């Protein structure tokens, strides 16, 4: 099923566990959406340090509890990039009016609206057909995923934007979790820790040659420069302002301070 449907099933207890895009989980637990704010991390190393920080994880777990979820870790879908069938995207204005498939989550919808695109939420399994039938002009997924899922067969323009890092929280139904022994719970947590390490390593390998593979398919690939990223970051300021109000100053400021602090460490 789609992510939203699976999350509803975990909440209801018909599914015991799922890994879900933070943006989709934010429909149930708004505060976790902060993980996927656009252009918020300067680089992947900083992002991992923040997301693996014990205080950050404890807070995420606390936000999930009242909604019937137990947070035990993440899976990862890498930094996201953009592909489309119309033209290269090098600046926010290039997104004007483009119908872009987005994750069914508020941060994604608001990000692309703010950048001038026409965000179209669709479940992941429907992307290829929607691109092929020109229901949408483009989509955002890691370039590695776009090559793997053959989106680059129908979208010949790609931009390595690294705009949103998709770490997918692994959530377990609270009732099911309570039925487990402490030893069983420990096994679940340990498995989640091994899984994210393997996941991140695999993504790094896959991403390393994604540009080369896309170019071999005659895809026009543009990589945002640091200057380009700054222009995009300024353009999404209204998204930060809106979600600071939703998450509350305390959680937002705490998270941003963690990013600042870790970005200064070598």
Language-model features and meaning:
Residues 1-46, 55, 62-266:
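N-terminal secretory/targeting leader peptides
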């Amino acid at each position: 099923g789609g992510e939203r449907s699976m999350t509803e099933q975990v909440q209801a207890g018909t599914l015991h566990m799922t890994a879900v895009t933070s943006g989709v989980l934010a429909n149930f637990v708004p505060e976790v959406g902060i993980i996927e704010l656009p252009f918020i991390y300067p680089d992947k190393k900083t992002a991992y340090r923040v997301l693996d920080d014990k205080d950050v994880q404890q807070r995420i777990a606390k936000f999930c509890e009242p909604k019937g979820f137990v947070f035990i870790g993440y899976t990862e879908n890498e930094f996201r990039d953009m592909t489309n069938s119309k033209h290269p995207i090098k600046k926010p204005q290039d997104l004007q009016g483009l119908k872009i498939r987005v994750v069914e989550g508020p941060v994604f919808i608001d990000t692309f609206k703010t950048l001038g695109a026409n965000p179209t939420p669709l479940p992941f399994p429907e992307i290829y057909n929607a691109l092929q039938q020109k229901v949408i002009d483009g989509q955002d997924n890691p370039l590695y995923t776009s090559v793997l899922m053959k989106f680059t067969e129908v979208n010949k323009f790609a931009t390595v934007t690294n705009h949103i890092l998709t770490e997918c929280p692994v959530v377990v139904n609270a009732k099911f979790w309570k039925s487990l022994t402490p030893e069983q719970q420990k096994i679940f947590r340990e498995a989640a820790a091994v899984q994210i390490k393997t996941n991140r390593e695999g993504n790094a390998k896959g991403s390393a040659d994604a540009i080369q593979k896309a170019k071999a398919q005659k895809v026009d690939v543009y990589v945002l420069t640091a200057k380009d990223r700054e222009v995009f970051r300024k353009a999404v300021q209204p998204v930060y302002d809106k979600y600071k109000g939703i998450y509350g100053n305390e959680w937002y400021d705490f998270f941003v301070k963690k990013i600042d602090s870790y970005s200064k460490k070598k």
